[in-house]
Amino acid sequence: VINFPDKTNHQIFLELESADSEEVYVNGLTTAMPPFAQEAMMRTIAGLENARVMRYGYAVEYDYAPASQLYPSLESKKIEGLFFAGQINGTSGYEEAACQGFIAGVNAARKVDNKEPVIIDRSEGYIGVLIDDIIHKKTPEPYRVLPSRSEYRLTLRFDNAFMRLFKKAKEIGILSKERIDYLEKAIETVNSCLL
């Protein structure tokens, strides 16, 4: 089996499943093949010629919709009222899926209420960077959020998120009255120290 014909070798890592297990995970070995092919490949690895497979790997494949067909609200440009989030947008990862689901859900609810969508700018948060990148840039592999993708990475910090996103969080309605009061006082305190 030749998965990448231009490569003559491939690095793998043998990782113990846990301290209490004798199972080893062969990280880097492709599992998008039937069991007989997985065994044959494993037997070519020095030291694993007689290894026993505990569970065969499997492949998961996903379809995706080109994110360039979405508005920054994650609503489809082709079908009004249809919002997309997660892997179907060409992203990978729990955080990426969660933040898109949040934005798509908020904007779907706002659409029903005839309210303007909530758009997070690149300068306001990594959610904004992710959405802007997937709808405006071609990404060759599933997209992951990385600080290096943001030109605002020095200002997109956890310690100032409440100042950057407070107004939108308040507008969306995800903050309790107590939290709003607390954050307004915190913002006032920070601003008074900056003057």
Question: What does each model-identified segment do?
Answer:
Residues 1-80, 84, 88, 162, ...:
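Mobile, glycine/GP-rich and aromatic-enriched active-site lid/loop segments adjacent to catalytic centers
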Residues 15-17, 95-96, 141:
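Acidic-residue sensor for enzyme active/binding pockets
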Residues 24, 55, 59-60, 65, ...:
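Residue-level signal for pocket-adjacent positions within structured domains
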